[in-house]
Amino acid sequence: MKKIVFSAFVLMGMASFLIGCKKKEAPLPEYVKQTMNLVWSDEFDYEGKPDASKWTYSMGNLNGWGNGEIQKYTDKPENVNVHDGVCTITALREGNSNRWTSARMKTEHLGKWQGGYIEVRAKLPKGTGTWPAIWMMPEANKYGQWPRSGEIDIMEHVGFDQDRVHGTIHTKAFNHKIGTQKTRSDILKGATKDFHNYAVYWTQDVIRWVYDGETFYEFQNTGNGWEEWPFDHPFYLILNIAIGGTWGGEKGIDKELKKATMDVDYVRVYQ
């Protein structure tokens, strides 16, 4: 009986430890605490499909999503589901084929923000060929189609370059098609093993990437017009795992890889 009781306490302790690891949060920067309030969040403190009042989905494979990606996006529970306080996006290989399904959840038409502190706590997938991203796109194309109206990549990671994370913006003047994108990349140890906080602090003067509470990169508004700074209108948030593509698939897709997951602890927006 003593062994049974002891084992129960051990299991309870382990569970508490694991929950504590997941819920340990990076501190908010003081400049956010002092000037902003929480205006939108999803803590994923429920079970089942993500809250339909906050999230919608991209579906199918729209010409490889402009990047040669091979996954087909769905909103099926095997590709996106909330359980035990975490929203999990799962990319799945279909049998032994080269066909994949995944999910791309977004706040388009449901949540949009012009400026603020947009924060996502997530654990990234492993595996060559995976391409997870936390990013923002314009609710309306004020200055025209991509990249004229802007894109904010809060975080990207490609599986062939383990634990290296990237923060990037795209505009008419600065984008990867012409090799001028403004970006920083660096190793974040444990990005695929542990939860980390990925955020941008966005004002009319600067976009600042903040990882685990520390400044990672900054892009300044130099006042040279919308071609460089189209960030004067609302953007929505996107969370996804892509498979393959011009960047994610640069080193191929691991033939042994059957499944890849990105776990999201919470999403919070301050203004």
Predicted regions located by residue number:
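GH16 jelly-roll
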Residues: C21-Q271
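Bacterial Sec-dependent N-terminal signal peptides
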Residues: M1-L28
